[in-house]
Amino acid sequence: MKEVIDTVGRRKTSVARAFMIPGKGRVIVNKLPIEEYFKDEFKRQQALRPLVITERAEEFDIKINVQGGGVSGQSGAVSLAIARALTEFDETARVILKTEKLLTRDPRMVERKKFGRKKARKRFQFSKR
């Protein structure tokens, strides 16, 4: 078995690399404790959901580097990276995580702005006369 498990998770434009080693349950995101990095409780819970569901929150130390996007995309990317690391460590966790849809890369991306329009779908105000 590998000493360090290295995985990647993506969501929107965010990319998270997770390095998982056996430890005491510390989670560090961009050199900050996860409580400081994700100040919003919901985003923190979303990021740590794979650990909570598999009941392995106290077994591993996880160091995460995350870049790009906003807070929501980053927490989704962190969640996917952690879920992939857990399955690499223990295949039995795969079934649990798959039923919770935590191993699925969310394909939704921001739709591009089109020319002749205000945003991707919103049009400029139309005047009949």
UniProtKB/Swiss-Prot annotation:
Transmembrane segments: none
Annotated SUPFAM superfamilies: Ribosomal protein S5 domain 2-like (SSF54211)
Biological process terms in GO annotation: translation
CC terms in the record's Gene Ontology section: cytoplasm; small ribosomal subunit
GO molecular function, one term: RNA binding
Entries under InterPro entries matching the protein: Ribosomal_Su5_D2-typ_SF, Ribosomal_uS9, Ribosomal_uS9_bac/plastid, Ribosomal_uS9_CS, Ribsml_uS5_D2-typ_fold_subgr
Keyword vocabulary terms for this entry: Ribonucleoprotein, Ribosomal protein
Positions in coiled-coil regions: none
Family annotation (Pfam families): Ribosomal_S9
Family annotation (Gene3D superfamilies): 3.30.230.10
Family: Belongs to the universal ribosomal protein uS9 family.
Protein name, per record: Small ribosomal subunit protein uS9
Organism: Pelodictyon phaeoclathratiforme (strain DSM 5477 / BU-1)
Gene from which this protein is expressed: rpsI
